[in-house]
Structures are given as structure tokens and as C-alpha cells.
């Protein structure tokens, strides 16, 4: 079964492409959703993250405030590297589990691994093809601000924390330009 790696910068429109492919019969592995799930209370990454960052990222029920955590890590490379180091192993483990399960069941036309950090996490070796969704930086910043209800500077920090366009191009088998509003 073909595994398509779907990647691109934040705000490029990966989720829209992913939703379209799902309608067409693809099985979607959403790395962002996995990342959200593995930092919940009771999960191994939760303990590592809360020990490192402390109570400043927790709400009154001791749940991780993802927006607060994001504002910290997207402004500080060392803290972002720590977060990636402690979460990627759990994310990759779950991605591998889902790929193997879907290969065994063969219920879909293909597998789409929707992963913004596909290259950074070295997940391209799990894919038969790499599809990169591209959008101009200003378009991406506007989308991220609207989607996440954050400031322009926070959006630019998130965009700046990812690989540049030339890096994505080097890995791309297909490039989808999503610079226009849908």
C-alpha cells in the first residue's frame, strides 16, 4: 500500500488537502492530532514536558495549555528542540503502529501521513512519495493568525521555526501551490 507523506509549512493548507484525500478514500494519519494526544495527562510525554517547563504551562486542572506552550517554544529554539526530542519518539511510535495496522487491514486506497515536521522528524523514509503543500509566507501568516487566534509575531515565529521552502522542495515528488484563498 502506498504511503504518501504530506507536508509543508504551517498555514500552507495541508489539512485541506488531507480532508480532500480522505474523501477520495485515503487513510489519514494526522501527526498533529497524535502530538495533541500524547501530551495529555497520563501520557508519557506529559510527565517529561511538565517536569521541564513547570507549572507555567498548566491550567488549574493540570492540563497542558498548548497555546502557552507554543508561545514559549516557538520563541526559543532550545526549548523547542527539547519539546521535539521528548515528543517525536512517541509520535513516531504511533505513526508506525497506524501504518502497520492499515497495511494489514487494507481498507483504504492509500495512506496519507499528514505531518508538518515530516522532514525534521526524518519520516520521509516511511513514505513512497512526498507531497509538499506550498503557500506564500504572508498568506500562511494570515491563516495561522486566524486559525490559532494569535498575533502576527507569534505566527511569524511559528513559520520561522520550520524548514525553509527550498528544503521542502528538495524532498518533494509533488508540489501543490495553495497560495490563493479557497
What is the predicted function of each stretch?
Residues 4-6:
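Hydrophobic anchor at the beta1->P-loop junction of P-loop NTPases
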Residues 36-109:
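ATP-dependent small-molecule kinase phosphotransfer cores
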Residues 15:
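Walker A/P-loop
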Residues 9, 21:
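P-loop (Walker A) phosphate-binding loop of NTP-binding proteins
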Residues 97-110, 124-133, 137-153, 164-182:
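NTP-dependent small-molecule kinase module
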Residues 12:
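ATP-binding Walker
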Residues 26-40:
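Short beta-strand-centered segment that lines the nucleotide-binding/catalytic pocket of NTP-utilizing
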Amino acid at each position: 500500500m502506498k504511503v504518501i507523506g504530506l507536508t509543508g509549512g504551517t498555514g500552507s493548507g495541508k489539512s485541506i488537502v488531507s480532508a480532500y484525500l480522505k474523501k477520495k478514500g485515503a487513510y489519514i494519519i494526522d501527526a498533529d492530532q497524535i502530538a495533541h494526544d500524547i501530551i495529555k495527562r497520563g501520557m508519557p510525554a506529559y510527565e517529561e514536558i511538565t517536569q521541564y517547563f513547570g507549572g507555567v504551562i498548566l491550567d488549574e486542572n493540570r492540563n497542558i495549555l498548548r497555546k502557552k506552550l507554543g508561545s514559549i517554544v516557538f520563541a526559543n529554539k532550545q526549548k523547542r528542540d527539547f519539546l521535539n526530542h521528548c515528543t517525536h519518539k512517541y509520535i513516531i511510535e504511533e505513526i508506525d503502529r497506524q501504518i502497520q495496522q492499515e497495511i494489514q487491514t487494507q481498507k483504504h486506497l492509500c495512506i496519507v501521513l499528514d505531518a508538518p515536521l515530516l522532514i525534521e522528524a526524518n519520516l520521509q523514509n516511511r513514505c513512497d512519495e512526498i507531497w509538499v503543500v506550498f503557500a506564500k509566507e504572508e498568506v500562511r501568516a494570515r491563516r495561522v493568525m486566524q486559525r490559532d487566534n494569535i498575533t502576527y509575531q507569534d505566527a511569524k515565529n511559528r513559520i520561522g521555526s520550520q524548514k525553509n521552502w527550498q528544503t521542502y522542495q528538495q524532498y518533494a515528488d509533488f508540489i501543490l501551490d495553495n497560495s490563493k484563498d479557497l
